[in-house]
Amino acid sequence: MNDNVLLIGASGFVGTRLLETAIADFNIKNLDKQQSHFYPEITQIGDVRDQQALDQALAGFDTVVLLAAEHRDDVSPTSLYYDVNVQGTRNVLAAMEKNGVKNIIFTSSVAVYGLNKHNPDENHPHDPFNHYGKSKWQAEEVLREWYNKAPTERSLTIIRPTVIFGERNRGNVYNLLKQIAGGKFMMVGAGTNYKSMAYVGNIVEFIKYKLKNVAAGYEVYNYVDKPDLNMNQLVAEVEQSLNKKIPSMHLPYPLGMLGGYCFDILSKITGKKYAVSSVRVKKFCATTQFDATKVHSSGFVAPYTLSQGLDRTLQYEFVHAKKDDITFVSE
């Protein structure tokens, strides 16, 4: 085990939970352009676009976990995706070489596969459809090139998570759970489409598992908590967790899309963004599943089932009193 670990970009949602679970097991420092709400004492302010800052920050470390990324849908200019996600990765690797660091864990994304693929595993061809996915794939290629220069000495682990949810997160899964829990949810379509999801408490434990088992070599993993749920099953999970009956209203898909187009037009007229759009209706009704056989046969055992992760999130967000109002925004 390599005990000295630098987390890059760990002031956000996943990084905060990773610090929480790993701080007792490793000598950890966080390098981020934002201060950490919960771990300021081990956080150094820095940016992956700043080579000098990286060169200095990596001194004395054995392993890097690279979490930093531009990931929002509305990043402008779009060149930021490539400046941070691709060139930032190059900068990190350059700093690693200067400091003799040979181990890196990189969080990529299932976005590298593109839309509407049938349960892709790690060997599925890449076909990213947006700048985020394209930049993540390019970053992976940079990492593989680095690894291939000294494969017997270097360790590269690439983790491609599906959508991650959990306590304090403000993203698409939270918005969906909030609508269901509040009784303001209307199912578009039959509700039989499946969605792959990942609970933050599990993915950070997998990263910690890989940190405890660093070895020379290259591995890539999809991360999904199985089994996948369809939308009807997700509503049932919310009902069970909150012990309340959720109104069951199904809107036919054509009507849902019509409503989405109406909001598209309204958005163009007013210049405002709305929670409903034709793209979101289409995504909501699509089956989005990814194969995670490899990660779940790697020796890692997730501490929570998907149902437990949902229950923990729902109880924290909609039942129990909160100690603070700190949240993390994602897509």
Swiss-Prot record:
What this protein catalyses is: N-acetyl-alpha-D-glucosaminyl-di-trans,octa-cis-undecaprenyl diphosphate = N-acetyl-alpha-D-galactosaminyl-di-trans,octa-cis-undecaprenyl diphosphate
Entry's EC annotation = 5.1.3.26
Q: According to the UniProt record, what class of enzyme is this?
A: isomerase
Role played: Involved in biosynthesis of the repeating tetrasaccharide unit of the O-antigen. Catalyzes the reversible epimerization of the hydroxyl group at position C4 of undecaprenyl pyrophosphate-N-acetylglucosamine (UndPP-GlcNAc) to yield undecaprenyl pyrophosphate-N-acetylgalactosamine (UndPP-GalNAc).
Could you say which cofactors this protein requires?
NAD(+)
- What is the protein name stated in its UniProt record? N-acetyl-alpha-D-glucosaminyl-diphospho-ditrans,octacis-undecaprenol 4-epimerase
Provide the active-site residues from the annotation: 132
A Gene Ontology MF term for this entry? racemase and epimerase activity, acting on carbohydrates and derivatives
Similarity comment: family membership:
Belongs to the NAD(P)-dependent epimerase/dehydratase family.
- Annotated gene: gnu
Give the GO cellular component terms, alphabetically: membrane; plasma membrane
